[in-house]
Amino acid sequence: MNIQLIKNFNPILKINTQSSNIKLNKIIPNEWLFILMNTGSFTQNLNSLLISDININISQKYNYNQPQQFHNTRTVWLANNNNQRFAFAQSRWIIKNNYTNYLNLLNNKPIGKSFIINETDLHKKIEEIYCGHSYILEKNFQSQQLIWGRKYTLLYNKKSFIVIQEYFSPNLTKFLKFH
């Protein structure tokens, strides 16, 4: 299975949202602030913005090597019906003990949708916001503008079990204009 991780993202701005006293609205454009700080389902928001279904291309790699522990790496491209890509996400799951309860969440659906279907209550803790350049992302987004992204942790029962990094196409701002 082809797991494509973004290792060569070159940030020119990186903000730790947990320890920063920076007023984000002073340095991040409103269009991006809306996307980056939203704690809801990005896939659902993208469906609403584009008023069309989003195609999801998922690759996963499982690792059961350690007893009582489960590892999963998952990459996702979100695109419209014309195969225009709007977001790339990579997630790393480390689940200790009783990981079989989580296996039904690992399907070809967006993570948020899986949790909604399984009625799992989560909290999204946004940890970092960044913008920069990446040849791979610029090629896939068909844009050489700055790429914004974020890193967050999903918490279940106040415990971290999934870390997600998302990178967003600069073309998204065409659908979000705040004046």
Curated annotation (Swiss-Prot):
Q: Does the keyword Chloroplast feature in the UniProt annotation?
A: yes
Keyword vocabulary terms for this entry? Chloroplast, Plastid
Q: Which InterPro entries match?
A: Chorismate_lyase_/UTRA_dom_sf (IPR028978), Rv2949c-like (IPR002800)
| Origin superkingdom | Eukaryota
Q: Does the keyword Ribonucleoprotein apply?
A: no
A GO cellular component annotation here is: chloroplast
The record's similarity note reads:
Belongs to the ycf21 family.
Instruction: Specify the protein name.
Output: Uncharacterized protein ycf21
UniProt source species: Antithamnion sp. (Red alga)
Q: Which gene encodes it?
A: ycf21
